[in-house]
């Protein structure tokens, strides 16, 4: 009997070890849960005096509701339910173990009065706001040092009503940098799903210093002529999954960042283990997918596949500058369809905006180990513009199985390269000689297959 028990225990342990090993081999998107956690306690925003007429200001009801729900954090968490209606509010903070749920027809509207958007200190990895030196306005929905937060619904809407902010930006009437729509700082286990985000004053979704972030089945839209509106911006984050979403903005649709010049170098928190798949992207004035230019903490271990990019100034854009320091390395982008794009693939080492004059010009970035493969482009103006830094070339840039059909009006020289080295195979039009180095072929990375992974 003792031998039988020992044998059973050995089998159980072996199975557990195998399951753990298989789980660790699965990409981040497969390991994340898709369903919102059960919350044993739920309240409706109307219980706190909110009125969904699109006119009544509901900042205090939202703040009071979250304050009340804090008491349930150690009791299984709670849900704040927002029913159908137009709920005008200023900035408010969330709490841990909370689900913010927007029913179909529910619209959270950002207030137009600047007093409803408090001023907060700049992020330490930036040293200033995105628009101006000094402090910045708090985002509409905020999370600071939180755990286990879900923002979801039945395709409810969060509308920043950003036109007022855009006009202030254009007319140089801002006193502080514009707010974002949703921002989580120093938080973990964040899920954002099944919602539409409209008209952010600046960036739409900004997780910064966060880990275990899941964004799926969302839509982001803004006016295509709005000033510098980004979609999703993972910033000094780890273990991030973005999938099954559609983003249409004026600037970068998805932008990976990690701090700005000496502030980012000193803070030293990289962005890593990023998985992006099955997303539709459009950027009228920027890039569909960008890396940097604020990347001073480093960006690595990025896996992107099954992108559809349309109507964008640039398709995939790696941007940095002298003074940034940091690195972008070990990124694989695969299975991309592009149409009506200005420049399909772009690298630049001259994106020279700095948060002040005190940056170190000797802090040179390292860009290496970037693979782009299995790409098709239609009606593309320029196949690629790849420009590194003199004395600091970008290396191990690998292109494979890429076919780009140029627009009739395209420049007859389809590739422009300088201070770049790498390898290419099965690429049309034929790329620059800088990308014909066979010694780089062994450095090209491969993308793990997602197809055999069961998704919960």
Question: Where are each of the predicted segments found?
Answer:
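Extracellular/periplasmic carbohydrate-active domains that bind, remodel
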Residues: 2-456
């Amino acid at each position: 009997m003792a031998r039988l028990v020992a044998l059973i225990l050995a089998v159980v342990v072996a199975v557990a070890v195998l399951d753990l090993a298989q789980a660790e081999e699965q990409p981040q998107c497969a390991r994340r849960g898709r369903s919102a956690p059960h919350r044993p306690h739920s309240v409706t925003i109307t219980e706190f005096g909110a009125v969904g007429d699109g006119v009544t200001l509901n900042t205090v009801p939202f703040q009071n509701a979250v304050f009340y729900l804090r008491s349930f954090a150690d009791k299984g968490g709670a849900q704040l339910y927002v029913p159908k209606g137009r709920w005008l509010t200023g900035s408010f903070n969330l709490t841990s173990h909370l689900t913010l749920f927007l029913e179909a027809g529910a619209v959270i509207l950002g207030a137009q009065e600047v007093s409803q958007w408090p001023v907060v200190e700049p992020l330490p990895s930036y040293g200033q706001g995105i628009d101006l030196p000094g402090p910045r306005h708090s985002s509409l929905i905020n999370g600071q040092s939180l755990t286990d937060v879900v923002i979801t619904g039945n395709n409810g809407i969060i509308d920043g009503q950003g036109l007022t902010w855009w006009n202030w930006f254009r007319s140089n009437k801002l006193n502080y940098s514009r707010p974002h729509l949703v921002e989580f700082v120093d938080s973990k286990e964040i899920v954002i799903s099944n919602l539409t985000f409209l008209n952010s004053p600046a960036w739409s979704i900004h997780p910064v210093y966060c880990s275990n972030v899941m964004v799926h089945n969302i839509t982001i839209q803004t006016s295509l002529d709005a000033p510098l509106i980004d979609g999703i911006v993972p910033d000094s984050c780890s273990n991030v999954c973005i999938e099954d979403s559609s983003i249409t903005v004026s600037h970068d649709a998805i932008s990976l960042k990690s701090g700005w010049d000496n502030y980012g170098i000193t803070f030293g928190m990289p962005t890593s283990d990023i998985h992006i798949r099955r997303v539709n992207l459009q950027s009228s004035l920027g890039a569909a997918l960008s890396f940097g230019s604020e990347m001073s903490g480093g960006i690595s271990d990025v896996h992107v596949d099954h992108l559809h990019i349309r109507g964008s100034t640039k398709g995939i854009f790696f941007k940095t500058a002298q003074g940034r320091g940091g690195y972008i390395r070990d990124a694989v982008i695969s299975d991309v369809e592009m149409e009506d794009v200005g420049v399909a693939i772009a690298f630049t080492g001259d994106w020279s905006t700095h948060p002040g004059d005190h940056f170190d010009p000797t802090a040179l970035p390292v860009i290496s180990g970037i693979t782009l493969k299995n790409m098709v482009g239609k009606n593309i103006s320029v196949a690629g513009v790849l420009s590194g830094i003199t004395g600091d070339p970008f290396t191990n840039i690998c292109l494979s199985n890429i076919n780009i059909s140029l627009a009739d009006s395209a420049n007859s020289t389809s590739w422009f390269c300088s201070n770049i080295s790498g390898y290419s195979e099965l690429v049309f039009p034929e790329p620059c000689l800088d990308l014909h180095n066979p010694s780089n072929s062994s450095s090209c990375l491969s993308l793990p297959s997602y197809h055999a992974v069961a998704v919960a």
